[in-house]
Swiss-Prot record:
Residues 188-215, 372-422 are annotated as: Disordered. Belongs to the VID27 family. GO terms for cellular component: cytoplasm; nucleus. This is Vacuolar import and degradation protein 27. Its main location: cytoplasm.
Length: 782
């Protein structure tokens, strides 16, 4: 639900942000002879309005509701009470209530006795002392929207107090406002966190007294005070850290906090963190980038407020506590994503889900025991390699020579162009093809000087009937002389385009099968005269053969449909023609050929599989999800099928597919999210590819960042800061990137309006200089 109403007018007062639904109540002190709680507006909205350069007000609007329309004496009494609360209001007092925002109102968040989120502040216009007002937020308003509203109020308080823009406010400035409001309120609030609680009584000196801190962390905590109503799935103690992007390290915020995961119903769960000075809450969801580091007994996650994303770390007392929390987290996250109960999941699938939730789990356990075993020589070598990568100034200076504007194939230039939309790299020659509206630009690489050159443009692409089409999902075909395309509209039609002629020469129908994705029958078929291709619909997998007589080109005897919609979403093939199919649910099926049952079914980890690519030999599978990559080792290690791959034989009951979940670490993604204001969304990830070459590097992108992973780095993570990925930031969003065929040294990158050739060694270790321009660091600290 979008609650922002920037620049929308309410009379002459612009509303900055609005909570669209809730109940407005008057809260009297316990000493009042009147009722402690009285409903003012049964249905209302709450807004922040700008009334001056650095002046703001909270405004509550009454929304007409049948339940409020009383008659007779009862209505008279209710109206009189309303007037006492609104005693200084204008004639609109029965429909609207407002108060200027200042430190005096002590605005803060709490929960009512029913577990609903409530916003409370001082009633400065009341007839009695210690009166407060309360806005109980409707259940259909998201927690993130509420947090956004609260942070807006605190920023307004900052501007009112300091008479300057809140863009200059540091995180500490806003936290001070929040803490002051909360501290002054808790003195009169019996439900507030008790600062004398046994859980926190020794916490004052724990910053330097690790023994006392350890004793506190061992305790079984009492339930949290201000959290949504629901069943506790987990309740533990930890220390709380926050990542400082300036110092590039985690800073202790509080030595002892309570941590709970709460089942709020309908497969939704809430992570609550509560200490003496800190209180955080967020939904259990993948978009907070949850990451476990078992080698350090830690859990990392992102927390977004306003347009700033912070990275927090919970550090548990020991591995047992971390594993206890991890088990609850993985289980609740899986239920949130799949809308199914954990008890319904088969035991083998449970093991796979739990084993795959850390990257790599087995390796991290090994690190715990052997983290200092590596030789100094090996560490020095890695350090040297890292320095060489980060000091590649020649490549930086050369980079401008290797950027080609895509506008070169727009004549005349079109102001309405949507920009580049895809990149396809040839295998047989040094060409690359970039789609842009109804054009395709042809580029070539020159190995002698590592340059990229614009060759030609295929313009005004149209179908056989002469209707202009914008090409989608291009795939090179038949010795790289043709492209297979869709038009983005007809899901059961494919087009074959002759590249040399620059024209569509054939149209293929797939009958009643809507093609979701398609690819070569074998990984390197585009280098051969092979004419068949494979594809998936939402409920089936099939082969397309253009030699079949008639319009429908589906090879029925080499196709398989499933009963009901499986929501297949992606397909990939190996050099031998083994097939992997992913679904929107997140599961993957492996086949040795079409038309039969899958040899291996890999359970879902929760996120949809957008794209699949495989290593040539079928040992590795790489799946692209929204914010993660799944790297799967398909080689069977145990049992009678040991040595085989999952395409040919099923995994034994005692063994699961080894899966590495690749993601951007929370402290890095926090900088990315704050800089781009967009969530992480990976483009299709690729292995480096070549005949007889070993896959050893992965490349993908999100926003303006191209990202590469080293397979060796993934398999040899040691818990240090030598991250297995490197990043390069561009001045525009990356549409797609892929390796030059036969090399893992150079990456072709399609930007919105440009095409670039970059060396992999120009990608850097993630740091504040790489992730954000220096000017944008003020987003965090003013």
């Amino acid at each position: 639900m979008n609650i922002l109403k920037k620049f929308m007018e309410s009379g002459n007062k612009p509303e900055l942000i609005t909570i669209p639904s809730g109940q407005f109540n008057l809260l009297r002190s316990k000493n009042s002879p009147k009722a402690a709680l009285e409903c003012i507006y049964n249905n209302a909205t709450l807004s922040v309005r700008k009334i001056g350069k650095f002046d703001y007000e909270l405004a509550v609007y009454r929304v007409e509701d049948d339940s409020e329309g009383g008659t007779g004496d009862e209505a008279e009494n209710f109206e009189d009470d309303t007037i006492s609360v609104l005693s200084t209001q204008s004639k609109k007092k029965e429909e609207e209530w407002s108060v200027e925002i200042s430190d005096k109102i002590m605005f803060h968040k709490t929960w009512d006795k029913q577990g609903n989120v409530a916003l409370v502040w001082e009633n400065l216009r009341g007839d009695e002392q210690d009166e407060k007002v309360q806005f109980v937020v409707a259940a259909d308003v998201s927690f993130s929207d509420v947090e956004q509203f609260i942070q807006t109020v605190y920023r307004c308080q900052f501007e009112v107090r300091n008479k300057k823009s809140s863009l200059t406010a540091s995180a500490d400035d806003l936290k001070e406002i929040e803490h002051r409001s909360t501290r002054l309120f808790v003195q009169d609030d019996d439900d507030e966190l008790d600062s004398s609680s046994d859980d926190f009584q020794d916490a004052k000196d724990t910053s330097f007294e690790h023994e006392k801190e350890s004793e506190i962390l061992e305790r079984t905590p009492s339930p949290l005070k201000k959290v949504p109503e629901g069943e506790y799935c987990c309740l533990v103690m930890s220390s709380l850290y926050m990542y400082d992007p300036i110092q590039e390290k985690f800073i202790l915020q509080e030595p002892v906090v309570k941590v709970a995961i709460i089942d709020t119903g309908k497969y939704e769960f809430w992570l609550a963190i509560e200490g003496k000075d800190n209180r955080l809450g967020t939904q259990v969801a993948p978009n907070i980038n949850p990451t476990f580091e078992l080698a350090t007994d830690a859990f990392l996650f992102n927390y977004t407020l306003q347009n700033i994303t912070l990275s927090y770390m919970l550090k548990f007392k020991d591995l047992d506590k971390c594993i206890q929390f991890r088990f609850a987290w993985v289980k609740c996250l899986w239920m949130t994503l799949n809308k199914e109960t954990w008890t319904d999941v088969p035991e083998k699938e449970k093991d796979y889900i739990l084993d795959s939730s850390s990257v790599p789990l087995e390796k991290q356990f090994d690190d715990i025991l052997h983290i200092d075993d590596r030789s100094n020589e090996e560490r020095d070598k890695e350090s040297s390699e890292s320095e060489n990568d980060s000091e590649d100034e020649d490549d930086e200076n050369d980079h401008s020579k290797r950027i080609i504007s895509s506008e070169a194939f727009e004549e005349p230039r079109r102001a309405t162009s949507k920009g580049n939309s895809s990149l396809t790299v040839a295998f047989r020659n040094n060409r690359s093809y970039v789609t842009r509206d109804n054009r395709i630009g042809v580029f070539k690489t020159d190995d002698e000087d590592d340059s990229l050159e614009f060759v030609a443009a295929i313009k005004n692409i149209s179908n056989l009937g002469g209707k202009s089409i914008d090409p989608h999902k291009p795939m090179l075909y038949m010795e790289d002389r043709n492209l297979i395309l869709t038009d983005g509209e007809n899901e059961n039609k494919l087009y074959k385009m002759d590249i040399e002629r620059g024209k569509v020469i054939e149209e293929w129908s797939t009958g009643d099968k809507n093609v979701v994705q398609y690819g070569p029958t074998k990984k390197f078929d585009q280098m051969t005269p092979e004419q068949t291709i494979v594809g998936v619909s939402q409920k089936g997998v099939f082969k397309i053969d253009p030699r079949i007589n008639g319009k429908n080109k589906i090879a029925v005897d080499e196709s398989k449909d499933y009963v009901g919609k499986y929501n297949f979403s992606s397909i990939g093939t190996t050099e031998s023609g083994y097939i992997a199919i992913g679904s929107e649910k997140g599961d993957i099926k492996l086949y040795d050929r079409l038309g039969i049952r899958a040899k291996t079914a890999i359970p879902s980890l929760g996120q949809a599989i957008k794209f699949i690519t495989t290593s040539a030999d079928g040992k590795w599978l790489l799946a692209t999800c929204e914010s993660t990559l799944l790297l799967m080792d398909l080689k069977i290690k145990d049992g009678k099928n040991a040595g085989n791959i999952g395409f040919l034989k099923s995994f034994p009951a005692s063994e699961n597919v080894k899966t590495y979940v690749l993601k951007i670490r929370p402290e890095h993604s926090a900088s990315i999210l704050t800089y781009t204001k967009k969530p992480i969304r990976f483009t299709k990830a690729y292995f480096n590819t070549g005949i007889g070459q070993q896959e050893q590097t992965i490349v993908t992108s999100t926003g303006p960042y191209a990202i590469s992973w080293s397979l060796k780095g993934i398999l040899n993570q040691d818990g240090s800061n030598n991250y297995p990925y490197r990043i390069r930031r561009y001045n525009a969003d990356v549409v797609a990137d892929n390796f030059e065929f036969g090399s893992d040294k150079k990456v072709i990158v399609a930007l919105k309006d440009d095409v670039s050739l970059s060396k992999v060694k120009s990608f850097k270790q993630p740091s504040k200089g790489v992730l954000m321009p220096s000017a944008s660091l003020q987003d965090f600290y003013g």
